[in-house]
C-alpha cells in the first residue's frame, strides 16, 4: 500500500510539474530585450499598435484586455511573445 501511494505521488508531481513558472519577454519595442519570471501567470502577451511614432510593441506577463485598434497575441510557452 505504501508503495502504491509513493508511486501515485511521484506520478502526480511529474505530471503536474509542480513549481513551474512561466518566463516571458517584457520589453517595449525600443528597449533591449529582457525576460521576466511570471509567477502565477499562464500566459505571455505581445501587443502592438501604430501611432505618430510608428509601430509600438509591448510585451509582458498575462493576457490583458486591449482597446480597439490594438493587436494582441497571447501564448502559453516560455518566451513565446518575441
UniProtKB/Swiss-Prot annotation:
GO terms for molecular function: acetylcholine receptor inhibitor activity; ion channel regulator activity; toxin activity. Its main location: secreted. InterPro entries: Snake_3FTx, Snake_toxin-like_sf, Snake_toxin_con_site, Toxin_cobra-type. Belongs to the three-finger toxin family. Short-chain subfamily. Type I alpha-neurotoxin sub-subfamily. This is Cobrotoxin-b. Disulfide bonds join 24-44, 38-61, 63-74, 75-80. Residues 1-21 form the signal peptide. One of its GO terms (cellular component) is extracellular region. Expressed by the venom gland. The keyword Transcription regulation does not apply. Binds to muscle nicotinic acetylcholine receptor (nAChR) and inhibit acetylcholine from binding to the receptor, thereby impairing neuromuscular transmission. Produces peripheral paralysis by blocking neuromuscular transmission at the postsynaptic site. Has a lower toxicity than cobrotoxin. Keywords: Acetylcholine receptor inhibiting toxin, Disulfide bond, Ion channel impairing toxin, Neurotoxin, Postsynaptic neurotoxin, Secreted, Signal, Toxin. It is found in: Secreted. It comes from the Eukaryota.
